[in-house]
Amino acid sequence: MASYTVSFIPLTLSNPRIFVSRQNGSPSSSSRIPLTSSLLGKKLLATQPSHRCFVPKLRCLTSASTVLNVPIAQPENGSSDKIPKWSARAIKSLAMGELEARKLKYPSTGTEAILMGILVEGTSTVAKFLRGNGVTLFKVRDETLSLLGKSDMYFFSPEHPPLTEPAQKAIAWAIDEKNKSDVDGELTTAYLLLGVWSQKDSAGRQILEKLGFNEDKAKEVEKSMNEDVDLSFKKQGQ
């Protein structure tokens, strides 16, 4: 099984790009493949925007970056054609998930963090669906702390909390399902949510079940798996 690293380059660089690096165990075998989005093109930026905060006689500049190791079977022909395009919202959801794990001072990024990342991003169709069904960010945070507990106040989360095994499997499931669909378009946040749901013993799945998400709701999400934006308001205006 090959490992793909999704790298989110900080905003401080000029002409930032996102790359997927294939790693087969040795640095010499890695290659860089642009992770593209039809919305923003190949120069897609998925980091949390850098921001400056001004305090009297104090100036600070912060910038966040994210690196995610995504396991997925290597294409038979060795080409990059099997790597699906990711929507900007899906990429941001993963980045926000890692930051949520860091906020909670967790040592790794789990399925519960991916779920929180989807809700933090908040503008995708599936995020709106979750909120409409009572699955909110605050509820997920509370359930996460109830299920996994609080981290030690003196513990410092890694700069890039690694993905847990269930989280890796959830992302691999999303990528594989997108490849199997043979549908043009990007890998959306719906694939990520259903990837979390597919891991039956994961924290993310348990939290979703606790908040009322079930197989019927999962089937509703499946109907719009290839849509990240609700365009129904445009259809009504035509």
Curated annotation (Swiss-Prot):
Keywords, ordered alphabetically: Chloroplast, Plastid, Repeat, Transit peptide
Region annotation (Repeat 1) ranges: 86-151
Transit peptide residue numbers: 1-64
SUPFAM superfamilies xref list: Double Clp-N motif
GO cellular component: chloroplast; chloroplast envelope; chloroplast stroma; cytosol; plastid stroma; thylakoid
UniProt keyword Protein biosynthesis present: no
Gene disruption phenotype: No visible phenotype. Clpt1 and clpt2 double mutants show delayed development, reduced plant growth, and virescent, serrated leaves. Clpt1 and clpt2 double mutants are seedling lethal under autotrophic conditions.
InterPro entries to which the protein is assigned, alphabetical: Clp_N_dom_sf (IPR036628), Clp_R_dom (IPR004176), CLPT1/2 (IPR044217)
Cellular compartment(s): Plastid, Chloroplast
Domain Clp R: 83-228
Region (Repeat 2) residue spans: 163-228
Chief place where the protein resides: plastid
UniProt entry tagged with the keyword Plastid: yes
PANTHER family according to UniProt: ATP-DEPENDENT CLP PROTEASE ATP-BINDING SUBUNIT CLPT1, CHLOROPLASTIC
Annotated domain remarks: The MYFF motif is functionally important for stabilization of the overall ClpPR complex.
Described function: Accessory protein regulating the assembly of the plastidial Clp protease system. CLPT1 first binds to the heptameric P-ring containing the CLP3-6 subunits followed by CLPT2, and only then does the P-ring combine with the R-ring composed of the clpP1 and CLPR1-4 subunits. Once the core complex is fully assembled, it then associates to the CLPC chaperone partner to form the functional protease. CLPT1 and CLPT2 are partially redundant.
Assembly and oligomerization: Monomer and homodimer. Binds to the CLP3-6 ring (P-ring). The dimers monomerize before association to the P-ring. Component of the chloroplastic Clp protease core complex which consist of at least 16 proteins: CLPP4 (3 copies), CLPP5 (3 copies), CLPR4 (2 copies), ClpP1 (1 copy), CLPP6 (1 copy), CLPR2 (1 copy), CLPT1 (1 copy), CLPT2 (1 copy) and 3 copies of CLPP3 and/or CLPR1 and/or CLPR3. Interacts with CLPC2 and CLPD. Interacts with CPN21. No interactions with CLPS1.
Stated family: Belongs to the ClpA/ClpB family.
Protein name, UniProt field: ATP-dependent Clp protease ATP-binding subunit CLPT1, chloroplastic
Lineage of origin: Eukaryota, Viridiplantae, Streptophyta, Embryophyta, Tracheophyta
